[in-house]
Swiss-Prot record:
Monomer. It comes from Rhodopseudomonas palustris (strain BisA53). GO terms for molecular function: hydroxyacylglutathione hydrolase activity; metal ion binding. Pathway: Secondary metabolite metabolism; methylglyoxal degradation; (R)-lactate from methylglyoxal: step 2/2. HAMAP family: Glyoxalase_2 (MF_01374). This is Hydroxyacylglutathione hydrolase. Thiolesterase that catalyzes the hydrolysis of S-D-lactoyl-glutathione to form glutathione and D-lactic acid.
């Protein structure tokens, strides 16, 4: 049976996610920005939390872990954070590991850059990737702990996933990302189409997530740093993709 995924808002602009296996009743929360919205979403669905899949240690992704662990006695799956910033961890995972949520299988990708410990969880059978703060719709995360080459390599790991894979990211940043991207590629038809879609969704009070990776590959300038047209738009014609990505990210930091 196909996984059931529920999306809701946490904190200010974080997304909360539940992924449920109807065959076994297992339910995972991807990250736990705060406990209350997750508890409410579980109650609405009549589900019980069995797992928390942590993408990285930032407080707006793990702030609800301890309370949820106490309430549900759920398993906490997390990266190898050497500084102990993720509470209540039961299972540490790394690149290539597979996590079971009931009968659902999540393949672990290490995607460092935003933080050194960052992970993405890929549910191949269900065509869903939970990318945390590495890849956003029409954007990417800031590089806080890693390096720009590291972040570019992480984006490439996500870019090779199938076009029909649904992207679930950590924040609702799409409108701001679109505004920046249009300044880089104003004539990109895929970006123009996504911009119109985002405007309509936000006007209706709807989330802009999930999006398809195929759409991101066509419209997300950060995934397109190795495209000659993108390099030319930032006056780096012929430059290495890492240099182009670095310039894009530095510009976005200042926007």
């Amino acid at each position: 049976m196909a996984a059931e995924i529920r999306l809701f808002t946490c904190l200010n602009d974080n997304f909360g996610y539940l992924i449920h296996d109807p065959a076994t009743g297992a339910t995972a929360s991807v990250d736990a920005p705060e406990a209350a919205p997750i508890i409410a979403a579980l109650a609405r669905e009549g589900w019980t939390l069995t797992d928390i899949l942590v993408t990285h240690h930032h407080g707006d992704h793990v702030g609800g872990v301890a309370e949820l662990k106490q309430k549900y006695r759920c398993r906490v799956v997390a990266p190898h954070d050497r500084n102990g910033r993720i509470p209540e961890v039961d299972l540490r995972v790394a690149q290539g590991d597979v996590v079971k949520v009931g009968g659902l299988l999540a393949r672990v990708l290490e995607t460092p850059g935003h933080t050194l410990d960052h992970l993405a969880y890929v549910f191949d059978d269900d065509k869903a990737v939970f990318a945390g703060d590495t890849l956003f719709s029409i954007g990417c995360g800031r590089v806080f702990e890693g390096t720009y080459p590291m972040m570019w390599d992480s984006l490439l790991k996500l870019r090779v996933l199938p076009d029909d894979m649904r992207l679930y990211c950590g924040h609702e940043y799409t409108a701001a990302n679109v505004k920046f991207a249009l300044g880089v590629e104003p004539d990109n038809p895929a970006l123009q189409a996504r911009a119109a879609q985002v405007t309509a969704l936000r006007a209706a009070g709807q989330p802009t997530i999930p999006t398809l990776l195929g759409e991101e590959k066509a419209a997300n300038v950060f995934l397109r740093a190795d495209e000659p047209s993108v390099a030319a738009s930032v006056r780096l014609k012929g430059a290495d993709p890492v240099a182009v990505f670095t310039e894009l990210r530095e510009r976005k930091n200042k926007s």
